[in-house]
Amino acid sequence: MHRWVVHEFLKETTTIGQRDPRLAVTALYDSTDERGPDFTMVYGSTFTSKNYDDNIKNRVWYRKYLDDYFRINEFEVFNSPINFRLIRYADVLLMYAEALNGLNRTADAYQYVDRVRARAGLAPLATVRPGMTQAQFQQQLEHERITELTGESLRWNDLARWG
């Protein structure tokens, strides 16, 4: 995963001023815990205690479907209790909002994006970005899909659809 994905998550805070909680379940990197590498846990140890070289310290890995927080050893055995989702309701809501926006029904589309944002504790778009044009709303949808669906094998289809 690239660092720009992390930066997408850091563009907004929740309604109570905290970092987007989806970041911690999507990415594993030196500051997955916002307090830094001394608090970021990797298989039961802190990121700092691993003594990774600089090449490793600067990387970002996918955390979705990883069971590192259920285990305390160094080995991934891929027996996580986390179900693999083929399609998520959040994806359906965002696709529907995109379709409405494509039909120039941008005002109607807000409510579907807001359902996804509410689960993450983010403020409604009508509050933080009211009156967006069709193009602005599309750009916001692209951000929403990155922060909600990264690591779920949907990005290629998004890019192909957006041109």
Residue positions per predicted region:
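Acidic/polar-rich alpha-helix caps and helix-coil junctions
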Residues: 1, 13-163
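Beta-sandwich/jelly-roll carbohydrate-recognition scaffolds of carbohydrate-active enzymes
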Residues: 7-10
